[in-house]
């Protein structure tokens, strides 16, 4: 639930006003990190995907058991003119799957939707293993204020309180992403539904973190290897074969409504789930985001290798140098996560934070690049696309302005970044065929 709150002062900068804010924008944040002008609402949905393989009950040599698979999406959306700002999310679980906390943000629960002249693009957010629909809530709110309907999924058998066999995540993650796309499509066509006239599912982007990024790569066209379907710890009874590169079943997943994808620390390349041949199938523009020291998904043999191998599409690789697997995606560690939990053998804080980078700074930089990327590839905004046309290594960029603020001829600093703030970053880019 989210309860309407009255906030005073700056909504973006008053990190001290409430605990566990998901809407913080640092004073040194790059230009596009700022929230948009639209008020936003939030609602929780429940959907069920019927007749899915029950991975947890599969037995070798037996018929595949089926079940109706429930999912819980959180939806952020532009709200009607005059909607206020501010609310709290109650009962949000931490990494231990037991402790619940309150988050504070901008969205108003069950606010009346906007009545736009044209519907907004759809963005689908997909968490890691484990995670939940609030892990990237900072992105959900931020992007909704900029004219997107954003849907973040609680993936059954992959959340903090019901994490189950990894095989379920391997098989179901891309299926969940596309089922939610279809579910939102259906709702948008229902007369009187709050999504009717609000969202255009033919213009969809996917944002996936870790195993969510794994799913996004598969949906974008990257089929898995035969070897990955045969690992001893694989999805059972050949069930991962449906995502095999070159198979009819995988090709059927490639949905023309999905126009682009962001994969943050996508897991799988470093463990042999993809190879260069399979990655040639990726045909959606991609923004890969990674920490150079990611010891879960890998960097040189992981996310960077995915970027290099996606030769059939335009793609970018944003690197947070010296960051680990938590680069970019998770919200700031809630205050309660700083304390040990008897249910974990590590402090929950470690699930959210990075040892080198400040989380809010990473969130703000990520908001900047995702705003530019989807602005270009979903909204066709060429001006936003210029924010991706950067000197590859920020250390090589020169900030040189005249006294009146106009750029000197040698000025090539990262667009939208204040002086001295584009540190520790690189943005690589390659076009289709490169």
Predicted stretch roles:
Residues 19-27, 57, 313, 322-325, ...:
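Alpha/beta-hydrolase-fold serine-hydrolase catalytic core, especially in secreted/extracellular enzymes
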Residues 109-120, 125-162, 270-271, 295-299:
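Short substrate-entry loop that stabilizes the transition state in hydrolases
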Residues 208, 212, 216:
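Gly/Ala-rich beta-loop-alpha elbow adjacent to hydrolase catalytic centers
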Residues 282, 288-290:
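Short beta-strand/loop motif that positions the catalytic acidic residue
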């Amino acid at each position: 639930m989210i309860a309407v709150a009255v906030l005073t002062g700056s909504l973006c900068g008053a990190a001290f006003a409430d605990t566990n804010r998901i809407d913080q924008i640092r004073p040194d944040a790059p230009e596009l990190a700022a929230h948009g002008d639209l008020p936003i609402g939030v609602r929780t949905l429940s959907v069920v995907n019927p007749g899915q393989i029950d991975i947890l009950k599969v037995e070798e040599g037996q018929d595949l058991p089926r079940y109706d698979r429930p999912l819980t999406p959180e939806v952020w959306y532009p709200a009607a003119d005059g909607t206020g700002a501010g609310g709290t999310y109650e009962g949000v679980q931490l990494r231990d799957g037991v402790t619940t906390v309150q988050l504070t943000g901008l969205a108003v629960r069950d606010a009346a939707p906007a009545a736009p002249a044209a519907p907004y693009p759809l963005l689908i957010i997909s968490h890691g293993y484990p995670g939940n629909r609030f892990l990237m809530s900072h992105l959900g709110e931020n992007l909704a204020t900029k004219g997107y309907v954003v849907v973040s999924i609680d993936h059954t058998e992959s959340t903090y309180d019901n994490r189950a066999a990894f095989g379920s995540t391997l098989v179901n993650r891309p299926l969940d992403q596309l089922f939610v796309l279809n579910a939102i499509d259906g709702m948008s066509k229902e007369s009187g539904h709050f999504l009717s006239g609000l969202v255009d599912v033919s213009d969809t982007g996917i944002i996936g973190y870790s195993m969510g990024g794994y799913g996004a790569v598969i949906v974008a066209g990257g089929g898995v290897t035969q070897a990955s379907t045969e690992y001893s710890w694989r999805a059972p009874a050949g069930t991962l074969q449906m995502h095999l590169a070159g198979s009819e079943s995988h090709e059927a997943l490639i949905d023309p409504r999905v126009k682009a994808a962001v994969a943050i620390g996508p897991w799988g390349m470093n463990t042999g789930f993809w190879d260069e041949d399979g990655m040639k199938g990726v045909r959606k523009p991609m923004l890969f985001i990674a920490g150079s020291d990611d010891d879960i998904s890998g960097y040189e043999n992981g996310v960077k290798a995915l970027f290099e191998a996606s030769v059939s599409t335009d793609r970018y690789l944003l690197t947070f140098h010296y960051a680990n697997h938590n680069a970019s995606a998770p919200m700031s560690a809630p205050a309660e996560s700083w304390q040990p939990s008897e249910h974990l053998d590590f402090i929950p804080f470690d699930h959210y934070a990075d040892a080198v980078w400040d989380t809010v700074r990473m969130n703000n930089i990520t908001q900047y690049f995702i705003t530019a990327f989807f602005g270009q590839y979903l909204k066709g905004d060429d001006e936003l696309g210029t924010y991706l046309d950067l000197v590859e290594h920020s250390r090589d960029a020169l900030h040189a302005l005249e006294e009146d603020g106009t750029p000197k001829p040698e000025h090539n600093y990262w667009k939208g970044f204040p002086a001295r703030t584009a540190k520790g970053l690189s943005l690589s880019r390659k076009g289709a065929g490169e």
